[in-house]
Amino acid sequence: MRTLLWMMAVFGCVAAVAKQGSDTSLSDAAAHYVSPEDLLGKPPADNWISYNGDYSGRRYTALNEINTGNVGRLNAQWVFHTDNSRNLEVTPVVFKGLMFVTAANDAYALDAHTGREVWHHARPISEGLIDDASRHINRGVALWQNRVYMETDNAHLLCLDARSGNLVWDVAYADWKKNYGATSAPLVVKDKVLVGTSGGDDGVRGFVAAYDARTGQLAWRFWTIPAPGEPGSASWPGNSYLHGGGTTWMPGTYDPELNMIYWGTSNPSPDFEGTVRAGDDLYTDCVLALDPDSGRLKWFFQFTPHDLFDYDGVETPLLIDTEFKGANRKLLVQANRNGYLYILDRTNGQFLFAAPFVDKLNWAKGIDAHGRPIRTDVKPTPGGMRVCPGYSGATNWFAPSYNEATRLVYFMALEQCETYFSKPTPESFKESREYYSTGVKQIPGEPSQKILIAFDIKKGSAAWKYPQVGSGHSSAGTMTSAGGVVFFGDDAHSFEAVDAATGKPLWHFNTGQPISASPMSYGVAGKQYVAIAAGSDVFSFALP
């Protein structure tokens, strides 16, 4: 029986468990620094070095051993079970044969070839959290040199030694007692670790913060809700800005050439109730372009001004360089929760295009020439109003992808409407309590349906659609490959592969568990693997 080496860290009851007899090559690989060149590399191949694979957010792998002609022969290679998570939302990160995954507040290093545990950093889940934070969600890690970074449910940023899992430092970057939490994977840019928070439904004031990757010292913080006297503060009378929402609960993307970070923000607070926050409610439901060195705002674009429907704008901002309307452009593409796909010039935030991608859409008639929605009279009422898309949105945080060969964007859409209710008197903010001013109900007899959409940004419409069978409640995202395949978790617990050009189904594997995560791909010793989390397990697949 193998001996376990327990090493207690100085911050709370935390342990790193290292498995003796680890493969020497893995130890050597983990000791190698993740260099700036590694972080800048794109598209990913053997290494899937960050949540989205690379800075662009495109989730496109250059590996092509697995392709449309042989993907039907994929077999499960290994399954790793985590101990403390009911439903993983993590995307594994792989560097030189070592895989890093998270579950609640735990981090694991695995042999990416065999699934064998190399080390385990254990941390108890936090008590007393509310809303999203109380679900103890963790979506993954970031890498830099020989360090691993993760957020915890109570908004701490941890720095771990990649070789052992031992704690290097621990920084509390928000106060959980004031309703803050964290669910995201961090993003490393240069020598800074960028983090965001959850709690936008609970009356927190959102921000993006950057910490020194070496020391954990705060470098800068950008508040997404402006204080009195700052640009955009007119929406927030008195002290309402302190509880205005606009959280940053998914990682952003980064353009090294422009030196700009792109980060999405969530809905305003109180949720569904606009009388106490008249105006556009900046900078909620936005994509922000920030300077990674200073945190200075370069530009912003707001998708849903004065949001009454919980249409967060945190969906991944895809960075795509391609011809658009006769010119080569640096584009930012986002399929938004409000039901529209947007295309912006990411150099300056100029609005270029928007189109609906769901049929069930009644809150707006369209998008005007400046990118603002043309609103209808639909809004929450005391008696209830049918609103489309519903509370879960026409899409959500589940990852989109972009294939460089097909030039199509792939994402999961949801056809759904719900009944929204408002309260005659808005509630006041209180700590340790959700800050909702309404509720939503499903509409009896009106089912929801998930659909995988391939969107042609040049034509401005869907190239194909692949309807799902299931409840409509899954949160699985996509990944695409140079082999011409789109991988995704479907709404009926299966990991699927379809032809990226046509949507033709090619392969599926029933995991027997809900899939609430997005897939990735990596290579070890010349062999390509694809992996996805389902339930409490991580599955890895390869050709025979």
Language model feature labels by segment:
Residues 109-111, 159, 210, 289, ...:
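Conserved blade-register residue in beta-propeller folds
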Residues 321, 414-415, 444-504:
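Loop/turn-rich, solvent-exposed surfaces of beta-rich toroidal or solenoidal domains
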Residues 316-358, 362-363, 379-390, 395, ...:
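Phosphate/diphosphate-binding loops
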Residues 112, 117, 139-173, 178-224, ...:
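Hydrophobic or amphipathic alpha-helical targeting/insertion segments
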